């Protein structure tokens, strides 16, 4: 997830410091509205998922937590929560929806703090603003995780939002040096050996100091997050530069994937259920294990079903997106041809 925050910051423009309304409108249109629309959709079908067996009260997440059908009161409360706090979404079908809120809060928070810092700093020190913001966010997250504090006005306490703001700022800073970085990795095979080095470091962190943007992250997990997150971004950036120089089907696929990331993000958990059915058949498991979140945990450390989960999580949403657009084109073409016929 840090990769998405860093990338969003990479494309942040200082022009929005004097055009806040446009920036906020874009955030509402691109983050708040999709969150509300799809959270309400999954809220409506939540209880139906129990009727058809996709969800159940026997199997759930890896720690044993399960979900339950909603009462009428819970449905109403979740609806209010969705609109007013960007919470209340279905944890088992929309588990990654926290990202909508995280990026929404992080990006607007970054804009606000940037304006405040510019007001406080002397004009000749204005270039230090992005670094100061990242430092402030790191210190706040350190304080928060060390003392177990919560921002009570933010769902899940605000850790993801603050760390998201830090990574957003890192992306903006990197943009200022992107040209110099590309020159550096363009010499003496630096792109190759730095990519390998970054990959090894990320792998070591994932094995010995596992960390992510879990909202309950400890102080140690907080300390072990920035390095692999930033190096993972640089590794991905190196690879993307290489891919961008080579035309072909792979590049076309990745461009199409990037243009339809939202659909993948919304439906990847639902797509996993197809692979879960296959795994249930293969191992002869209880059919109710399809309710496991996000994937079936049994044998997950031994088998290679993660490959199929990855393919399905990306491929099925993309395939459905492509098919739906083709159908819409056919329908529009049919209506246009019907309308042009003489009566």
Task: Enumerate the language-model features and the residues they cover.
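Alpha-helical transmembrane segments and their immediate juxtamembrane cytosolic regions
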Residues: 1-343
């Amino acid at each position: 997830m840090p990769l998405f925050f860093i990338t969003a910051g990479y494309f942040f423009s200082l022009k929005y410091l004097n055009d806040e309304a446009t920036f906020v409108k874009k955030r509402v249109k691109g983050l708040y509205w999709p969150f509300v629309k799809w959270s309400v959709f999954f809220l409506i079908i939540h209880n139906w998922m129990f009727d058809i067996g996709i969800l159940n009260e026997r199997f759930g997440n890896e720690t044993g937590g399960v979900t339950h059908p909603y009462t009428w009161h819970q449905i109403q409360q979740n609806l209010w929560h969705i609109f007013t706090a960007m919470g209340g979404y279905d944890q088992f079908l929309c588990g990654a929806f926290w990202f909508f809120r995280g990026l929404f809060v992080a990006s607007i928070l970054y804009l606000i703090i940037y304006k405040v810092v510019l007001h406080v700093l002397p004009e000749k020190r204005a270039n230090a603003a992005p670094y100061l913001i990242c430092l402030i966010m790191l210190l706040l997250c350190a304080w928060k995780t060390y003392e177990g504090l919560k921002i009570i006005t933010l769902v899940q306490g605000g850790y993801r939002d603050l760390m998201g703001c830090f990574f957003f700022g890192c992306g903006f800073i990197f943009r200022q040096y992107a040209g110099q970085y590309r020159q550096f990795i363009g010499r003496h095979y630096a792109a190759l050996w730095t990519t390998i080095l970054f990959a090894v470091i990320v792998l070591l962190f994932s094995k010995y100091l596992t960390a992510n943007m879990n909202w309950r992250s400890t102080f140690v997990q907080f300390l072990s997050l920035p390095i692999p997150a930033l190096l993972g971004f640089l590794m991905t950036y190196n690879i993307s530069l290489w891919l961008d120089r080579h035309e072909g089907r792979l590049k076309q696929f990745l461009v199409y994937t990037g243009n339809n990331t939202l659909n993948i993000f919304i439906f990847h958990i639902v797509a996993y259920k197809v692979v879960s059915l296959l795994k249930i058949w293969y191992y002869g498991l209880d059919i109710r294990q399809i309710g496991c979140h996000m994937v079936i945990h049994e044998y997950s450390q031994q088998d290679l079903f993660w490959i199929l989960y990855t393919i399905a999580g990306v491929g099925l949403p993309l395939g459905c997106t492509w098919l739906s657009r083709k159908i819409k084109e056919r329908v529009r073409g049919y209506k246009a041809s019907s309308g042009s016929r003489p009566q």
